[in-house]
Amino acid sequence: MTRHDVITKSVAMLRLRRDDLIGKDLITKSAARLRLRRDDLIRVGRVIVVSVVCVVCVVMIASAPRWGATHALLGIREAPKANTTSAPLTVDQAKRILARTFTAAYLGETTSGAAAQAQLRTAYTGEGLRGVSGRVKLASVQLAVSASLLLAPHPKLLAVSRGFGFPRFIIAQTVASDGGLPILHLLVSPDAATPYRISMSAEMVPPATVEPFDRLSSGSPLVTNGTGPQLTNGTGLAVAPATLLNLYAAQMAFPAKAISKAPFVADSFAVQVRAGAAGAAGAVASQATYTQVHAVVPSSVYAVRQASGDALVFGVLERTDSFAVKPGENVNTVANKAFVLLTGKKLVTKAASITTLEFVVFAVPRSTGQATLVAAREQIVAGSGS
């Protein structure tokens, strides 16, 4: 074998080994499967490795509490803490809400049709909407409630909620231009997507007054209560708001139920309701058995702390007057125009019921003493008969 033959054979063997190695190279195989060149795949791998290292470094730096300067350099800031010592509304914003809401309420009660219903839904919510709907429906047979909201062109803003959580509230007072009793209004907003609407309105009971709240710029806090989404135990008050309203509802029942150590002072509204129940029972005694029960509407209770540490408690009771007609008897209901308008029935042979909402506001002392009724209103909202 000549020298030239030896060199040629050696070169051929080297090429064979190189081709064999290339065929077995993992990177080359991967590149072939991805339809990339081997060098391109290597570059991609390097970029991925560098990116992962950078991300890990940033995460470690951001999570280290001592790296304040690094946080600032990277633009990292702690989320701001919720402000619990100021009002979510300015005075001007609250007054604009009152103007918008009262305007819608006025239009809803002074117009008719679908537009009127839409205005009422804009102005009222919950039991407030049930009450005003009943009032509008019975306007032709029922004495008008002390003037419409807009007869008091400048509502007095008494309080707004504190903090930026929910629910939020506004408390306002109006005085009718014809000299009627002042009316307390509670407006609520349950969440960020729902505007403020009137939850309840009630005439003040003479000689009651409303003690001052904290300044409007700081807002007034809700007091914890036994029921409802916003309230838990009534700490710091002479009686828990839920307990107060449940006992008040129980003592107004007919037949009467004795309440020992009532946490509230006797008031003219309760006396009037009980007298009406006794009169109704006497009027139908020979024809039907009459009962009356009162129950607190779930989640209707709002207790707002005042500057003195006392609280103003808002709540709604649902009253049900029931008539069980005795066998062989008929009850003529023509005289009860509201019942006839709601049910279309002028004669009842089996049973009948009337549902009335009672809007009440109490002043509850901070530690000792009895609660005092500040405002009250009742409104028939439904009836049934057979």
Annotate each predicted stretch with a short phrase.
Residues 139-182, 288-334:
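Surface-exposed, charged secondary-structure patches
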Residues 1, 6-41:
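Long, intrinsically disordered low-complexity tandem-repeat segments
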Residues 67-75, 178-243, 306-314, 324, ...:
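Short beta-strand edge/turn micro-motifs at domain boundaries
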Residues 54, 63-72, 266-316:
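Charge-rich, low-complexity terminal tails
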Residues 120-123, 129-153, 161-167, 173-176, ...:
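Solvent-exposed, non-transmembrane segments of extracytoplasmic/periplasmic domains
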